[in-house]
Amino acid sequence: MPRADCGPGSLPERGLQGDVSAEDRNSGRSRLGYRCNMSKVGNLRGSGGGIVSATFEHCSYTGSLFPGNNVVRQPGVQVIDASNPARPRVVGSLADTAMRGGTWETLKVNKKRKLLAATSVPLLWGGGFFAVYDISDCEHPRLLNRGPGIATPLPFTSHEGGFSPDGRTYWASGIWPGHLSAIDISNPAVPRVIWQGLHGFLGHGFGMTPDGNRMFISNGLGINILDT
């Protein structure tokens, strides 16, 4: 891959792009940060956030962290309107049992079906609670499942998660052991676990091919390839 051409106002790495050298750390240069062809447009000081956030259209959804996000004025996942990027603003919060439990690396969007989903991960590992939202109106997400996953737990564990490309399945992956669950959301009002398995000693990080037929999931020492 060729080196990026960084224009005026940029602060790129002086050596290998993407690498913070020992020289930069020792000299204090790394404290200034790095940027290439990026400039700040606006900012918002909210209630803090969790590990992973998600975006759809002009909206951003800030992941929650348990228990801290439960003691702020608007608990749960913050909904941010960034239609005016110079002045983004909080327009609501998602405060169901899953979103308040800490979303860790599970808060994801499927653009094809206009869905937002997450599981409850209080600290590194969790499970049971799962929420699916319709984000057709991105500023006003609408909770679709009020029974399984919200009022009653589902039988899965999770640390991270994500949609299949078609948006009809949500995959929940527990960090240890390598526990993987497929949650059918073809009818998002009634999510149900349709498959579970152990793929390795642990799991952290997965991706899928665009056709949804293959999953690549880490196992701590390498990658497992699953036919999905």
Which role fits each region the language model picked out?
Residues M1-T228:
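Feature marking well-ordered beta-strand scaffolds used for ligand recognition
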